[in-house]
Amino acid sequence: MGRRPARCYRQIKNKPYPKSRFCRGVPDPKIRIYDVGMKKKGVDEFPFCVHLVSWEKENVSSEALEAARIACNKYMTKFAGKDAFHLRVRVHPFHVLRINKMLSCAGADRLQTGMRGAFGKPQGVCARVAIGQVLLSVRCKDNNSHNAQEALRRAKFKFPGRQKIIVSRKWGFTKINRADYPRLKSENRILPDGVNAKLLGCHGRLANRKPGRAFIDAVA
């Protein structure tokens, strides 16, 4: 018996049902890799960022997430180069889908019990997605911006419902506005932290102030 189509589980009707000690025997999600490309490139390398945003409240299966990741990665690798981008899948499939198996062969009426004890067995997993939630994000250089948008347009066909491609106003995957980033960096208020960056402020205890630095680490 094949896998039940994901359209049967598209609407969010019930509460979150994650894998736990009460919900055992859950099959592994099809998507295992969430970061693709040059994921170790510093925050200054890729200033441009574009998002694929869900415009519906729905369940997205792990198979759809994997198909979209492959489609986006394949296009970017071919037209931009494997060293020219960083793709990140922003949703994780934690919600378990159940199926109440019915026998459809001859003589099945003596074996199955219909809707008696209809709480099903785990069949797969999906991600619960809200309106305005980011599904995929790509950061790259400005000269590959059109390739990133086309890659997300192709990945959009792997998802149900409506999605929008939105060019971010932020610098890469950070929360800092792109217009403000060069100025803050020249003032030494940006502390690179992998693919992200910390913004140093001047609030905090004087004991945390370091010599020769006007700003205090926001974490301190």
From Swiss-Prot:
Family in the record: Belongs to the universal ribosomal protein uL16 family.
S-S pairs: none
InterPro entries, alphabetized: Ribosomal_uL16, Ribosomal_uL16_CS_euk_arc, Ribosomal_uL16_dom, Ribosomal_uL16_euk_arch, Ribosomal_uL16_sf
Keyword Cell membrane (UniProt): no
Protein keywords: Ribonucleoprotein, Ribosomal protein
Gene Ontology cellular-component terms listed: ribonucleoprotein complex; ribosome
Organism: Euphorbia esula
Keyword Signal appears in the UniProt entry: no
A Pfam match: Ribosomal_L16
GO molecular function per UniProt: structural constituent of ribosome
Gene3D superfamilies registered for this protein in UniProt: Ribosomal protein L10e/L16
Subunit annotation: Component of the small ribosomal subunit. Mature ribosomes consist of a small (40S) and a large (60S) subunit. The 40S subunit contains about 33 different proteins and 1 molecule of RNA (18S). The 60S subunit contains about 49 different proteins and 3 molecules of RNA (25S, 5.8S and 5S).
Gene Ontology biological process terms, A to Z: translation
Protein name: Large ribosomal subunit protein uL16
